[in-house]
Amino acid sequence: MVNMKASMFLTFAGLVLLFVVCYASESEEKEFPKEMLSSIFAVGNDFKQEERDCAGYMRECKEKLCCSGYVCSSRWKWCVLPAPWRR
């Protein structure tokens, strides 16, 4: 009976140790994707949005005209794709 208790205790202790090691390595790996994403999506001066003379899709069209291929929705005042009944 003692051998069975000892083997169960060692098995349980091994599983706990395995869990701790996996958790520690996973927490270190979590920093890598954050660093990678922050370097990929870093916004510099080169990537600023240009100001257009026309409004694009789902942009307000109160003051600006919609770009070609879009129409101003009379209900929402957004630039939307033209539907067959709007032509």
UniProtKB/Swiss-Prot annotation:
Signal sequence, start to end: 1-24
Chain positions listed as propeptide in the UniProt record: 25-52
Coarse class of the protein's main subcellular location: secreted
One GO term describing the cellular component: extracellular region
Cell location: Secreted
Domain of life, source organism: Eukaryota
InterPro entries in UniProt: Huwentoxin-1 (IPR011696), Huwentoxin_CS1 (IPR013140)
The keyword Secreted appears for this protein: yes
Sorted UniProt keywords: Disulfide bond, Ion channel impairing toxin, Knottin, Secreted, Signal, Toxin
Disulfide bonds: C54-C67, C61-C72, C66-C79
GO MF, one example: toxin activity
Tissue expr: Expressed by the venom gland.
UniProt record similarity statement: Belongs to the neurotoxin 10 (Hwtx-1) family. 51 (Hntx-8) subfamily. Hntx-8 sub-subfamily.
Domain notes: The presence of a 'disulfide through disulfide knot' structurally defines this protein as a knottin.
Function: Ion channel inhibitor.
Protein name (record): U3-theraphotoxin-Hhn1a 4
Organism from which the protein derives: Cyriopagopus hainanus
Organismal lineage: Eukaryota, Metazoa, Ecdysozoa, Arthropoda, Chelicerata
